[in-house]
Structures are given as C-alpha cells and as structure tokens.
Amino acid sequence: MKTSMQSKLDQLTTRLAELNDLLSRENVTADLDQYRKLTREHAEIGPVVEHYAQWRQARADELAAQELLADASMRDFAEDELRGARDRMGRLAAELQTMLLPKDPNDERNIFVEIRAGTGGDESALFAGNLLRMYLRYAERQRWQVEMMSESPSDLGGYKEVIVRIAGYGAYSRLKFESGGHRVQRVPATETQGRIHTSACTVAVMPEADEIGEVEINPADLRIDTFRASGAGGQHINKTDSAVRVTHIPTGIVVECQDDRSQHKNKDRALKVLAARIKDKQYHEQHAKEAATRKSLIGSGDRSERIRTYNFPQGRMTDHRINLTLYKLEQIMDGDLDELIAALVSEHQAELLASLGDAE
C-alpha cells in the first residue's frame, strides 16, 4: 500500500474517533442539521476504517509469520500463514483503493429523467413510453418515489417528451449513466411486411438542485408564458390558462409543465426542472475539457451520442460504451437493470483509478 494512501486512512481513523466522541454527547441532537451531517459522515467513513483495521491485522499477521520462518519446525505453517496474510492484504488494499475514489457530489441526489422521442416518428414515441416504464419499474424495485413533472403524449401512445422526478437515496449514482441516445430495432405493430425498423430516443438524467436558490437564476432572465393545457384532462382542460412555459433567456432553455390544474404548481415544477437543466448544463461545461482528453462514461452530455441498442428480434441489449451485450431484453425492459448498472459503475471506477494513476 502506498504511503500517501496509508496516511489518508490514518487521518480517516482519527476522524472517526472524533465523530464517535461528538455523536456520544448529550446535546448532539440540539442542532438537527449538524447531527445529520455528522451521522452521514460517520456512515461514509465507518466502512473504510473497518476495512483499514482488517488490512492492519493482515499486516500484523504477515510480520508474525515472517518471524516464525526462522523456526524450521514451524516453516510449513509459517509459509501458509504468510500466503494467507498477503492474499488478504492485496484484496483489502484493492477494495480500499476503490472506497477512496473521489465521490461525485451529486450521487446521493434525487433526479429528473427526461425522455424525448427522436427519429422514427410514432415508433420512437412508443419506445419513449417503453423506456419510461423501464425506469419506473427500476425505481419501484429500489422503493424510490416517482412524480410526473411534464408529459407530451403522442397520438398512438407513448410520448413525444416526458419528464419524471425520481426521489431516493443514490438515485443519481445509479442512473447517471443513462444519458444519451437509445436506439431500438424491432418490428412495429403497424408494420404489415414484418420489416425491422430502427428508431431512437434520447435520455437526459439531471441531478435535482437541493433548492432553487442553489442555482442562481435572475428573475429578469425569465420569460413566463401561460397557455391552455392540451391533452387528457376532461372539461376543465380548456377553461383556464393553467399550463406554464418558462424560458431562460441567457441559455435558451425552455420548460413546459401542464400536468396539474394549478398554474402555481405547474410554475413551481417548471422552475425545479429549469434549475436542474441549468445545473446539468454547467456541470457538463465544467467537465468538457476532461471529456475531450479521455473517454468518460458520463460523456459530454450530447444527446445524440448513441450509448445503447435494444434489439427486440434477437432479445438483446448492447451498451456500446463498455461493449456489453446481454440477452435478457425482456427482463431489462421490465426494470431489471442491476447487472447493467453494476457493469457501468465498475467501468467508471476503473476510469477513475486510471485517471488517478495518470495524475501520480
């Protein structure tokens, strides 16, 4: 283990002892915000320090076994102990290196998932609906909460565009690799000749700002228009201008919300989505240089960047970024994304390790 890494782990061990002392004090819950910060930090550091304690024990076992090697009668036993200790040290050091990788500050945040139909007309809109269901089913498996923010249904079903808010611990960390172009190959229900059609949708996954104020938005930079909602909604739908369109003039970002009968609620939702879009834009601009110098799974944020193909006749899904093909398309479309996400997270961690190696 490198000296720099061991020094960092020693610092974390000291910090954990400090946290244990702070959390054991009688008045610890007097400031609930501070208490939450301390417990969150404790939860993050605890497993790392525990792993480090196991590594130090393995190191002590290695030194003890080396001393036994001098005794001829104990040599076979000592060699077995030495091998076991070194194996444990190697495994624990590798796990610790992964645990110490830089954390994405957005990983724990709630998210907005925006799906837009692309090339392929009605078939693309239908696939947008399929993708939405896939993410909703995955969210259900994680016991996350889902809220529809905005939807623009297509004539034959599916969506021209849809935005949902997914709230749950680690939502961004699990779904941040979904941004990009998703291509589908299948025989549409309206196809009489049995020909396979190719269409596409784009997905954008944006971390939710903790508060609207986290992203600086000058009210003077906003143009807010109201109009009558369209689509399902019964008699009420054409009576009031409850739908809201918010335009952020400096960036040209436009958000429409019309799902609620309350203009106030639609405006509030639109501003939340707008804040997330601006935050997402700033994030990708900030990382543009990094994305240009090395391949990154999160990419440039370019919607046209094709990341995945869903081939229904062959029952396969291929993620082009990591050259992963899974022949379990039906399960994937039903929200079984664990294997795919685990592979993407693993590749991302490998990228981070490589970049740290380059920096050293």
Swiss-Prot record:
It holds the Pfam family RF-1. GO terms for molecular function: translation release factor activity, codon specific. The modification N5-methylglutamine is found at residue 235. InterPro entries: PCRF (IPR005139), Pep_chain_release_fac_I (IPR000352), Pep_chain_release_fac_I_sf (IPR045853), Prokaryotic/Mito_RF (IPR050057), RF-1 (IPR004373). Methylated by PrmC. Methylation increases the termination efficiency of RF1. Keywords: Cytoplasm, Methylation, Protein biosynthesis. The keyword Heme does not apply. It is found in: Cytoplasm. One of its GO terms (cellular component) is cytoplasm. Peptide chain release factor 1 directs the termination of translation in response to the peptide chain termination codons UAG and UAA. NCBIfam families: prfA (TIGR00019), PRK00591.1 (NF001859). Belongs to the prokaryotic/mitochondrial release factor family. This is Peptide chain release factor 1.
